[in-house]
Amino acid sequence: MSKRDYYEVLGVERGASEADLKKAYRRLAMKYHPDRNPGDKESEDKFKEANEAYEVLSDASKRAAFDQYGHAGVDPSMGGGGAGFGGANFSDIFGDVFSDFFGGGRGGGRGGAQRGSDLRYTLELNLEEAVRGTTVSIRVPTLVNCQPCDGSGAKKGSTPSTCPTCGGIGQVRMQQGFFSVQQTCPRCHGQGKIITDPCTSCHGEGRVEEYKTLSVKVPAGVDTGDRIRLSGEGEAGTHGGPTGDLYVVISVREHEIFQRDGKHLYCEVPISYTDAALGGELEVPTLDGRVKLKIPEGTQTGKQFRLRGKGVAPVRGGGAGDLLCRVAVETPVNLSRRQRELLEELRDSLEGDSSHSPKASGWFDGVKRFFGDL
């Protein structure tokens, strides 16, 4: 029986886009999948036919050959790529959500043994957790070996068949004009074997989507951008390939009091007008608790005090940084009549004596010189 045109099988125009092909194939695959039609030979044949059509049309080189030469361009007996059950990338069709999460396709298809992809997980911590270290539990979506087929992709009790396209050697010779080029077999991807009876749990992929719960020990002193590598906790490899790694990337949330710059911490300390003028002592917060800070008389806004060793001990070793407290002098508001009278008396007593406000006096002298030079 002659094969139907692949575009006709999928029900699309010859100029259909990749998205249109995928949509059409997904619709047919869901409709005729053996799991949904157990024992229905006609549905199984239609499923295989749709699978074969999509394998060819979703591959740019195979599609070009089919468009130019028809079925002869992709017939294994003619030295082309060939098509058949087991070629379509089910992870691409049924795994859009996970593909988006991991930032792209999964690659590999049903090729040779390949290492699993590395995964990235962003872990948010507060400043105290980052400085002191902590242990957290995370839940990560990943791909693990399919248990029913033990990662082989083949239905239990079945075995992969010799690839009819390359005869089991994993290479094909393509004739391009006067030249003959040897390349990796596009059907078995160099394995020499193909899965003709795929596992219904993983659709022949050998891997299934699953959430994994892991305990992550975060060392003290980490900062935003630091990475913790968990070896072997990434995606499972394909066809016996090694498992990838999981990289936990640290992101430290903003703190309501402290700002961090490397191993040093910074904070702003508001003090009263009178404490700034007369001096005093106040308590300031640190990550280890409150400490007393002595304020000398005549302290101005912007004055910075250093508390040594009250910063962060870097994760890569070395002494702890410092806590730098920047003073912000608050002007009194909501004054009572008596308070206002006292301040007016103070202002009158200071008027004409520049020694009490050296910075202001110098600034006004500069202004006078500026206008005098105009």
Swiss-Prot record:
The alphabetical list of record keywords is:
Chaperone, Cytoplasm, DNA replication, Metal-binding, Repeat, Stress response, Zinc, Zinc-finger
Where would you say this protein principally sits, based on its record? cytoplasm
The yes or no answer to whether the keyword Zinc-finger is present is yes
The record's free-text note on cofactor binding: Binds 2 Zn(2+) ions per monomer.
**Pfam families from the xrefs?**
DnaJ, DnaJ_C, DnaJ_CXXCXGXG
One function term, GO molecular function aspect: ATP binding
The UniProt family comment states:
Belongs to the DnaJ family.
Query: NCBIfam families, per this entry?
Result: DnaJ_bact, PRK10767.1
Name used for this protein in its record: Chaperone protein DnaJ
